[in-house]
């Protein structure tokens, strides 16, 4: 067997290596360092010596030890007399022993509390071998007899009639019997003790130390000591400042029941790093556990006080394959909570840095004033939304938009009867769904524009659904009433089918016929808007900190990040510290929709602000805060949260999703760098481009941003194979153009969104595999088969349909079944080679590689035509 080092023995016993070396040298072994190795038999002897304080027989000859006192002759005689008396009266003595045992157990229970206190005190003191005055056997305690134990002394005096008590062989058997009787009750108590509270530091767990141990060799020389079974072995928490370990007798008993020096050998400790012992702690019963919406498996296990393996195995039983780093969705969290019987409260960690939630609106009635209503104009493309707003503003915005369609969200202020009204103009193109939804969510009233000559269209229905979802009042403006084809009743009927019933038909929706060209009905429309605003009683507190919605954001040369906003509450002034998502800063300048400088923006009004640290996302809420530090903290926390969320996306997939992922990897992709003038347009373009895909091709947007095309964009495009740069409403500068030319990067710029989408579709179509179709050329019937040496078969044919061309692809058809496909190797008319033979003529046809032609077969000639695929 392999030798055992001293430091391994020290670890096993829980003592310092120096103390083990001292004891080993007392046996005359001459150990110098903790790395010295000894034979297993010597190691067993060291264990026995440290535990029993008795020198093994093999070492007694070499060591001069003080001679042990011989037992007195009187004691020997008394023992012999006692043995004789036991033989004569075994029954009487057995009863006396049982009575002694019962009394001793009572005393042990009475002194249990004192012993526990003493053990706790001793546990905090560093132990040494020198302090061990008497060998303490596993599972045994030595109880000193007290003066007040008179009853026990009386009982023992009866036994002492045959001189002093000394445990003989029969007594040893009775001790074993006592232990075996207590074994079953001990196991029951262990089961009851399993449910205990975690806050209790000291475990009262009892140990089954009786199995496979021989207690027959126990004897005592001291008549004032009684051996009792120790049923209250406790695992006490070690103080943090104590480094020395307690003797690990339990491990020895479990690992090798025979122990050192006995039959069974020595259990060698592994050289692997010792695993960290996790103290068993029961979970305190709590009313509810707060669980984050986005939580990993190991974090969830820690929250509920379970091990990660328990949670993973539970998920496995529920049919979910997860690892400890995978995120759990809300359904999985609720299912696990039910499985573990725990009440949970799902929270959103984003609430911790939700500056909108922290914003307090003043509710003092004295400070509330009527604010300007916010009106959003929505509808289908080309139904005249912007033209209608132009007439109201007396401007020409529509003519300035590329392609005659609105591609930006605009906010404008107008006055009617001395009252201000804020209008939001939204795009009608299908690509701008997010813009329309954003406009509906921050508005007070929605005007749905429908062309009288065109009726309800898809974007009309979508706009109505957005307005209904936002829960805002709807006013229907039937535009183009000046046209001859105008049919307002058709519009009313179509909208009535969507549960938009006119007031004149008994409904609750106002319908106004207008003409953006002539101005018909515009005044009536504004009157209805103001009337509806009065009904809503729109009020705000201009004295509080400002709260606004970002309608649009962009980067302007010389000004940096700018944002179009509508103030909902409070007053925003120059110098105000603001935060909007990940952007923050001080308002350096403000202007209205016509470019005039402003000093403040009141509730319900719109304007453009300059001073944000970066381009804020359209739709973000902007809040004014007290200090720059507060704004920076909010923005940084939001940025870090979003970053961690992006980096920690789970990569797990279900079996069903795995096939889709593999298929996704086989897709061809068109790498694109996308730049736009404003955030809203960029958002619309990204959404539209991501939809341009099929089972073979897709668009891969490797980078997108607001602002002009930069040299870094060109560098990124050059690093990506076959990538192009797409610009919307922006133009590259001279340096960027030169750089792109040097790098071979293609830049395409557009000012109309559907032109950009059409070009990208064409590019994707060119990358797709062509569509191959067949064009039938002709058919011929075989009337004679001629075998030509060294050439093969030649078919004498009559062309029955179309033409047969030399080199064309053919099929040999027999009884309606294709038996061979190949090419025409030779075509002759009489003895001359022919390029083609038309219908009604005879010819000789040789088929490449075919020697199985028969009379009555048909030869079908065709060619393959390739067509470019398109999305």
From Swiss-Prot:
Span list, region G1: 379-386
Domain (tr-type G) ranges: 370-537
Annotated GTP binding sites: 379-386, 425-429, 479-482
GO cellular component: cytosol
UniProt-annotated stretches for the region G4: 479-482
Span list, region G5: 515-517
Residue ranges, compositional bias (Basic residues): 61-72
Family per similarity comment: Belongs to the TRAFAC class translation factor GTPase superfamily. Classic translation factor GTPase family. IF-2 subfamily.
Protein name, as recorded: Translation initiation factor IF-2
Record organism: Campylobacter jejuni (strain RM1221)
Top-level taxonomy: Bacteria, Pseudomonadati, Campylobacterota, Epsilonproteobacteria, Campylobacterales
Gene that encodes the chain: infB
